[in-house]
Structures are given as structure tokens and as C-alpha cells.
């Protein structure tokens, strides 16, 4: 299942309706959770309670019926996630009720929507202008309507399509992620860490300080909150753009990609490096590699990181040695050494901006 995300531009009247639908879905979500906490665990019995709930609360009819029904499934999905975390030894609390302002999305799961003449037509809302910056390929199974904390609205189309494997390249590569360099690969390319958070933190702190000085409930406080949300949103967008382009490059050009199996949740507990590891978003990068590889017919092989950075031969870079050892383990040939695999032409440091601007870390196309 793929997700296509597009910006929505509702009118003031449409935004008012969208906010009313969000509130209706939040109300139903909390009511379903209340019923579950009261001992009702049958999903279909809970769905049967919705018509009576709408009779008691006529304003709920402002929302599309399937959107309200989806909140029953959302509660059960969240409960399953908590149960899975608990089985894996994680400490988890109870599912929480959603407060006003903390409910961000609702779903048209099967019907009630269509695209027509540059507009997304939603049942109970009407036609909303949408910026379709790319073609949707595949069968649309549902639409998520989401409001970001910055106040921007988006439509996320859930699309089912057939994966199309890329042509085999015969190329293999090992990747070692790090703090100084975002990654070093076994061909001798070192991608600089973009450090988006470090570059944004001062702006975020200034906006947090301004927000803290505004009177609660005032219009000025809301304006300050939106400015802060936009700063965080820009940070996330910059980071995701970099990670998507870099992961896409490796998927397009290498048939096998070997990486370390990292315990990132444990690593971030390091008080000196935790923030830098989170800023680098290694976990997100590795997840992008994995799901893109699955669709493209590529292989991402995770290896045990133990010992990959030890016993560095004279004249070799430590991160390059680690990348070569990761590759040899990924190929199932641990006896291969960096010396036998051959030194790189010359380690080349590539600015993160090169990846963002060209979509490739290399000054040439790998084919």
C-alpha cells in the first residue's frame, strides 16, 4: 500500500466543516474508548451502538457515517499496538482519551470521495481545491484528511498497486551510518550529516520563548503557536526530503545493500550522542531503504554490528572499513577483508545539499 500526500486549500466555510468533522470523530473515538474501558470488547457490538449515539447527538451527522465507524477500528488498532509493545517487554500505559486540538485526522475508508477538475470532493464537505503535484498510480482504497499543527490541511490517498521490480544492476554496497558523516559506503563516498535540527534549534527556541510570553487563550498566543509549529514542520520536511532522495539513490543503483542491525532506542540513551542520533534519523533512513527495496525487488541485508569498526588496517578510514565489513557480512563472506576488497579511489565527502539538490550523492550517474 502506497500513500500519496497532497496539500488541500479549503475555503473558510469548508475549514469550519472540516473542524466540525474532526470534533465529531474525536467525540466518537473517546466514546468508543469509554465503552471498551467499561468492559465491551466486541468490535461489531460497538459499531451497532453508533446509530443510537448519533440519535442522542444529532450534530454527529455532520460527519460522513463511514468516517465515524472508522473510529471504532482506530481504537482497536491502537489497542493492538499497545499489546504488541507489551509483549515485547515495553512498559505501556492505558490508551488515552483524545483532548481538543490533539485529534488531527479522519478517514474516508471506502467511499464518499472523488477527484474532479482539480478538486477533492468529500461527502458532507464539497469540492476542496487540491494541489496534485504528481500522478496517482494504482487503485485508491481510501483518503485520510489531516490537519497539521501549523493549520495546513492535507489529503493522503491510500493506494494499492502492483510493485514493479527494477532491472538488476549486479551492484552491491555496504553502508555504515555515523554522527560525523551521515553515512560512509563501501565505494568510498561519505555523505555529510545535514544536522537539520542543529541548524534550526535557535529559531525554534526563539519561537518557544515568544510563545511562553503570550497570554493563554489569546489570539497572539495562537499566532505564536502556529509559527512554532511551522518551524517544526519545516524541519521534518527538510529531513524527510533528504532521507527519501538518498534512500532512493541506493535502491535505484544497487541490487544488494548491507546495513547494520542497530538498537537505536538503546543508543539514544547516550547523553552525549542521543540528540545527534535522533537528529540524523538513522532509523527512518533504514526503514525507507527496507520498504523501497521490497517494492523494487532489491535486498537490504541487516548484519550484526559487532566488531565492524575494529582492527582498522594502516592507511584505511575507520568508517570505510566498517562499510566494507558490513558488505562482506551481508554477502555471507565474512572472511573478506577491506584490504582484499581493495582501497577506495579516494574517500570523497559529499555535502548533504548535493543530495537534496540533485537527488544523488554522486557527481555522476551510477548505471
Give a label for each model feature.
Residues 1-69:
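Gly/serine-rich nucleotide phosphate-binding loop at the start of the catalytic core
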Residues 37-40, 81-91, 293-300:
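Surface-exposed helix-capping loop/turn segments at secondary-structure junctions
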Residues 39-47, 88-98, 339-346:
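Short alpha-helical "patches" and their helix-cap loops
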